[in-house]
C-alpha cells in the first residue's frame, strides 16, 4: 500500500513542519491539524461528544455532520495553506469552544473535584513521609517526600520503600491507594478521601457566586488592583485573620486557587465567507458567551465540625462578612501608602 509514513506519523503525533513557507509543508501541516490540531480536531470532536453524553450537558448540542462537512483546506498568499470552515458552521464552532470551557470551569474545576484532589495530594504527602521514613512536621518536608516517592526512577527499576519495605515498580493508581492503606486510614486526609465524607464546606460554590459575594469590594477595582486583592485573599495573613476571629486552626481552612485556562479562538481558526477567508475572532460577537473572563478566583473551605454551629448558612454569611472587612482594611492600608 502506497502510504506516506512520515506524514502518517506526523498526523498521529501532531509534529508539524517548522518551515510553513514551503507549499508542500504548509499543506501537510494543515492535514496534521485536522487530526491533531490545537483547537478542533478529530480526537477533540470525539471527546466533546463523549463529554456531552457522559457529563449530562443538556444545554449543548452539536451538529457534527454540519461541522465536518464544512471543513476545507484553503490557500492564501500570506500564510499558505490552512484549515478553514464554511460560515454555515459558525454556531457549531462556538458550541465546541463553549463546551470545553464550560467543562473546564464547572466540572474539572468544580469545588468538590478540587477539594477531592487537594485531599488526595495531602494524603499522599503524609503517606510518602511514612513509607520513606522521613519527618512530616513541615509542609516543605512533606512536599519533598512526595517528590521523592514519585521519582521517575521507580518506573525503570524497582524501589524498596525504607519503612514498609513495599516494592514500588512501575507504579499505578492502585499502588498509591495501597500505600495509603498501609500507612494510616485514620489520617484526616486519607479518611476523608476514602470515605468521600468531607469535613470542609465551601463558602461559595462557583466563580459567579465568588464575584457576586465580593462585588462590593471588587466593583470599583481595575484588573490589576483586583489581582492584588485576590493575592491578599489567598495569603497566610487572611487565613490567620480568620483563625483569630473564629478560633480555628490553620488546618481547618483550605484555600484553593483557580486560574481559568479558557480556550480562545483568536486568529487560529479561519472561516470561509463568500470566498473570503476571515479569522473567526472577527466574526464572533462573544468569545466567552458561556464562561466569562479569565480572572483568577479561589475557593475557601471551612471545617464547620470544629465550630459546632447549628445554622451553617448564617455562619457562612458571617465569615464572608469578616473576610470583606479584612480585604477592605487591607485596601485602605494600600491606598494610604
Task: Outline where the language-model segments fall.
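Histidine-centered, transition-metal-coordinating active-site segments
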Residues: 1-337
Amino acid at each position: 500500500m502506497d502510504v506516506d509514513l512520515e506524514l502518517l506519523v506526523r498526523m498521529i503525533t501532531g509534529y508539524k513542519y517548522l518551515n510553513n513557507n514551503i507549499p508542500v509543508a504548509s499543506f501537510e501541516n494543515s492535514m496534521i491539524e485536522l487530526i491533531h490540531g490545537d483547537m478542533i480536531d478529530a480526537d477533540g470532536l470525539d471527546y466533546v461528544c463523549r463529554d456531552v453524553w457522559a457529563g449530562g450537558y443538556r444545554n449543548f448540542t452539536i451538529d457534527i455532520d454540519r461541522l465536518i462537512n464544512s471543513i476545507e483546506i484553503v490557500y492564501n498568499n500570506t500564510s499558505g495553506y490552512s484549515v478553514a470552515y464554511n460560515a454555515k458552521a459558525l454556531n457549531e464552532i462556538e458550541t465546541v469552544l463553549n463546551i470545553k470551557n464550560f467543562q473546564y470551569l464547572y466540572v474539572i474545576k468544580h469545588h468538590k473535584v478540587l477539594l477531592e484532589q487537594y485531599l488526595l495530594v495531602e494524603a499522599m504527602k503524609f503517606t510518602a513521609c511514612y513509607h520513606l521514613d522521613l519527618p512530616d512536621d513541615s509542609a516543605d518536608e512533606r512536599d519533598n517526600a512526595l517528590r521523592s516517592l514519585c521519582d521517575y526512577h521507580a518506573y525503570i527499576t524497582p524501589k524498596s520503600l525504607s519503612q514498609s519495605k513495599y516494592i514500588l515498580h512501575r507504579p499505578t493508581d492502585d499502588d498509591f491507594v495501597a500505600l495509603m492503606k498501609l500507612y494510616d486510614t485514620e489520617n484526616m486526609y486519607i479518611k476523608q478521601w476514602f470515605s468521600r465524607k468531607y469535613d470542609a464546606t465551601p463558602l461559595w460554590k462557583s466563580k459567579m457566586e465568588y464575584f457576586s459575594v465580593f462585588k462590593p469590594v471588587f466593583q470599583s477595582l481595575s484588573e490589576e488592583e483586583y489581582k492584588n486583592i485576590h493575592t491578599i485573599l489567598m495569603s497566610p495573613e487572611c487565613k490567620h485573620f480568620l483563625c483569630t476571629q473564629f478560633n480555628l486552626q490553620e488546618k481547618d481552612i483550605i484555600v484553593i486557587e483557580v486560574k481559568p485556562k479558557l480556550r480562545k479562538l483568536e486568529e487560529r481558526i479561519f472561516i470561509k465567507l463568500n470566498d473570503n477567508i476571515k479569522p473567526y475572532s472577527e466574526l464572533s460577537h462573544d468569545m466567552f458567551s458561556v464562561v466569562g473572563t479569565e480572572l483568577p478566583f479561589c475557593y475557601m473551605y471551612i471545617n464547620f465540625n470544629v465550630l459546632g454551629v447549628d445554622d451553617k448558612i448564617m455562619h457562612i454569611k458571617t465569615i464572608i462578612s469578616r473576610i470583606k472587612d479584612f480585604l477592605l482594611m487591607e485596601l485602605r492600608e494600600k491606598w494610604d501608602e
